[in-house]
From Swiss-Prot:
Record's signal peptide: 1-32
Subcellular location: Secreted
Organism: Rarobacter faecitabidus
The name this protein goes by in its record: Serine protease 1
Biological role stated in the UniProt entry: Major serine protease exhibiting lytic activity toward living yeast cells. Similar to elastase in its substrate specificity and has a lectin-like affinity for mannose. Mannoproteins may be the native substrate for RPI.
Superkingdom assignment: Bacteria
Length: 525
């Protein structure tokens, strides 16, 4: 499927989903075009860690291949572009702070070869040149442009339903109004007090309606999960319009995965967050739908306009495009106006609530799409806005969490007599809060007690293999996963940690074929 240039009119912009797990199979991805150099650029308000450079090991071959495929560029071009994008990300907040009211936006050029910064004075242009970017002298600063765009929302005319969206375009230094007629666009501009020369009009026949797979009382299994946060996860607000207390289910098991704590659809936001249900715990990773692989998430630093952008969703899976513009006010109808970022990545029904990623940085939550795989345009809710709004913290792949692992007869995994010597077989014991029971979950998949790793003795894989404590050595026999079903699985043996002979206190731990028995069920406390 080939996407046209994003300057072409897009059709049937719509919401794209109802909640579901990120492991549900979906349709093939589609291609995306080069970006329009237009957007409002903001410094990231999140507290995420600095992203790695373009050559980061986390940018694995599968992810790079998707960028090459969807953006139709070579591998060498992709690597060069990613390096430039990282430079733009670092420059953006620094220049915005240094230039203040002289700053009028930052974006990456259409050819992906230079960083362009809008400024209002020649003196500011010299600062931009010194920083290694290309200045463009314009009339209005970014603050002024944003105020003009905001006036459209505050002074909407009676026929606002015929206005699809509006945004700031720093490349032209104007506000762009997209509507189904010039008359509707002019009415919006007039109501906002915008004068000729300060705005542009784009005419489109779009009918913007909610089209997600949602019916009253259904399981919302048609959406996608975005990012884990501490204590829960994020998804789209229109996937949880029932609000606080609504139960969300996962298509991995068909069972409950979370309970909505807060949601908002309209008044600028399309997001929801739910508390984890039962034994479910999120990891700082996003699937890219290629053989079960994924991308480690290390923060939420915002990418610059013109940067590549990839999306993970249950329907179109892993698709990539460009970040076209920021702070687009999208009118979904029925009073639902949301401020989103626009990309040329493809998204369809069921992708709502999914994750947008730039390199190893979380960017946003899938909200809407034009539902046209021949002219891909999609919109996401910036994740930092949501994290700040509800005071949430993103779970990242670099985090280490410590807890007690409880199981059969409510006993905890335990090192006998706090003897941390190599080769000590682990047991279950009455939970007592000692260091012998504190298990740390590490990003590399190891589980550690007192700095040593849980280990399958001699890397054996047969039933009855002892689970012991050993110095960490990087072998796959020391990697475990605790899934939502409560199975603690050794990755090497693909067998479950099991309490031998269904023993009580002092029962030894071994690996055994997963059976679903109570002596193989574990949870963190």
């Amino acid at each position: 499927m080939k996407c046209k240039k994003p300057s072409a009119l897009f059709s049937a912009l719509a919401l794209v989903g109802a909640l579901g797990a990120a492991s549900v199979l979906g349709a093939a991805s589609a291609n995306s075009a080069s970006p329009v150099a237009a957007a409002t650029v903001q410094a990231s308000s999140g507290s995420a860690k600095t992203s790695v450079a373009a050559t980061s090991k986390s940018q694995d071959g599968d992810v790079l291949a998707a960028i090459v495929r969807d953006l139709k560029i070579t591998k060498t071009q992709a690597k060069k572009r990613i390096k430039l994008e990282e430079k733009a990300r670092q420059l953006e907040p620094r220049l915005q702070k240094k230039l203040g009211k002289k700053f009028a936006g930052l974006w990456i050029s259409k050819n992906g070869k230079k960083i362009v910064v809008g400024v209002t004075t020649k003196k500011a242009a010299k600062v931009v040149k010194k920083a290694g970017a290309t200045p463009k002298i314009v009339k209005s600063n970014l603050t002024t442009l944003k105020k003009r765009a905001t006036k459209i929302s505050k002074n909407a005319p009676s026929d606002i339903k015929n206005v699809n969206s509006w945004w700031v375009d720093p490349a032209t230094n104007k506000v762009v109004i997209e509507a189904r007629s010039k008359k509707a666009a002019k009415a919006a501009a007039t109501a906002a007090g915008l004068t000729a020369g300060t705005y542009e009009i784009t005419v489109s026949d779009d009918v913007i309606v909610p089209v997600r797979d949602y019916w009253g009382g259904d399981a919302l299994s048609g959406c996608t999960l975005a990012f884990p946060v501490y204590g829960g996860f994020l998804t789209a607000g229109h996937c949880a319009v029932e609000g606080k207390g609504h139960i969300l289910k996962t298509e991995m098991t068909g069972g409950q995965i979370g309970t909505v704590e807060a949601s908002q659809f309209g008044d600028g936001i399309d997001a929801a967050w739910a508390k984890n249900y039962g034994d479910w715990n999120g990891r700082g990773r996003v699937t890219h739908w290629n053989g079960g692989g994924g991308v480690d998430i290390k923060g939420s630093n915002e990418a610059a306009v013109g940067a590549h952008m990839c999306k993970s969703g249950r329907t179109t899976k892993w698709t990539c495009g460009y970040l076209l513009r920021k702070d687009v006010s999208v009118n979904y109808g029925n009073g639902h106006i949301v401020t989103l970022n626009e990309t040329s990545a493809c998204a369809l029904g069921g992708d709502s609530g999914g994750a947008y990623v730039w390199n190893d940085q979380a960017q946003g939550i899938t909200s809407g799409s034009n539902m046209d795989t021949n002219n891909c345009r999609s919109f996401y809710q910036p994740v930092n806005t949501v994290l700040n709004k509800w005071k949430l913290s993103l779970v990242t792949s670099t985090d280490v969490t410590t807890s007690y692992v409880q199981g059969y007869q409510n006993n905890c995994i335990d090192v006998p007599n706090s003897d941390f010597t190599d080769g000590k077989q682990l047991q279950v014991w009455n939970c007592n809060g000692t260091n012998a029971q504190k298990v740390s979950f590490h990003p590399d998949g190891t589980l550690r007690i007192n700095g040593k790793c849980l280990d399958a003795r001699w890397a054996w894989t047969h039933n009855g293999t002892e689970v012991q404590l050993m110095n960490c050595n990087g072998h796959i026999a020391q990697k475990f996963t605790l899934n939502g079903a409560g199975d603690l699985v050794n990755v090497h043996a693909n067998k479950c940690v099991d309490v031998k002979d269904w023993g009580g206190q002092g029962g030894k731990l071994q690996l055994w074929e997963c059976s679903g028995g109570a002596n193989q069920k574990w949870w963190r406390r």
